[in-house]
């Protein structure tokens, strides 16, 4: 049996937020098709970017407090792997 991910209790909330983002992205595509004003399109892109960043940061927080904490408590090579994995995820988020 595999262990539950840290976000499992919030899965419905994340799915709802991501469906909202999906709708926003479709709206942006429609704006482009309809030749909407550039700044209006950019404003919507900024909103989507912020929404995705919020989801990513919440997922990262749950990963750190659940998956990484559990691996560190258990010790061994799994802990080092989880720490390296978290560090790489943070680096990707900072670069984006």
UniProtKB/Swiss-Prot annotation:
Binding site for Cu cation: 38, 63, 67
Gene Ontology biological-process entries: negative regulation of DNA-templated transcription; response to copper ion
GO-annotated molecular function: DNA-binding transcription repressor activity; metal ion binding; transcription cis-regulatory region binding
Entry-linked InterPro entries: Metal_Tscrpt_repr, Metal_Tscrpt_repr_sf
Residues modified to N-acetylthreonine: 2
Keyword Acyltransferase recorded: no
Induction: Negatively autoregulated. Induced by copper.
Mutant phenotype after disruption: Disruption of the gene results in the constitutive expression of the entire RicR regulon and hyper-resistance of the cell to copper.
Cystines in this chain: none
Keywords: Acetylation, Copper, Cytoplasm, DNA-binding, Metal-binding, Repressor, Transcription, Transcription regulation
Record's subcellular location: Cytoplasm
GO cellular component, one term: cytoplasm
Primary subcellular site in the record, as a coarse category: cytoplasm
Entry superkingdom: Bacteria
Misc. comment: Constitutive repression of the RicR regulon by a 'copper-blind' RicR results in extreme copper sensitivity in vitro and attenuation of virulence in mice.
PANTHER family linked: COPPER-SENSING TRANSCRIPTIONAL REPRESSOR RICR (PTHR33677:SF3), TRANSCRIPTIONAL REPRESSOR FRMR-RELATED (PTHR33677)
Function as written in the Swiss-Prot or TrEMBL entry: Under low copper conditions, represses the expression of lpqS, Rv2963, mymT, socA, socB, mmcO and its own expression. In the presence of copper, RicR dissociates from DNA, leading to the expression of the target genes. Members of the RicR regulon are important for copper resistance during infections and full virulence in a mouse model of infection.
Family, similarity comment: Belongs to the CsoR family.
Protein name per the record: Copper-sensing transcriptional repressor RicR
Native source species: Mycobacterium tuberculosis (strain ATCC 25618 / H37Rv)
Primary gene name: ricR
């Amino acid at each position: 049996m595999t262990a539950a991910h840290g976000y499992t209790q919030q899965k419905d909330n994340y799915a709802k937020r991501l469906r909202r983002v999906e709708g926003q992205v479709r709206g942006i595509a429609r704006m482009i098709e309809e030749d909407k004003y550039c700044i209006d399109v950019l404003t919507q892109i900024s909103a989507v970017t912020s929404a995705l960043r919020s989801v990513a940061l919440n997922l990262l927080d749950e990963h750190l407090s659940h998956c990484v904490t559990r691996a560190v408590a258990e010790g061994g090579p799994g802990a080092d792997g989880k720490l390296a994995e978290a560090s790489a995820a943070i680096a990707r988020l900072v670069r984006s």
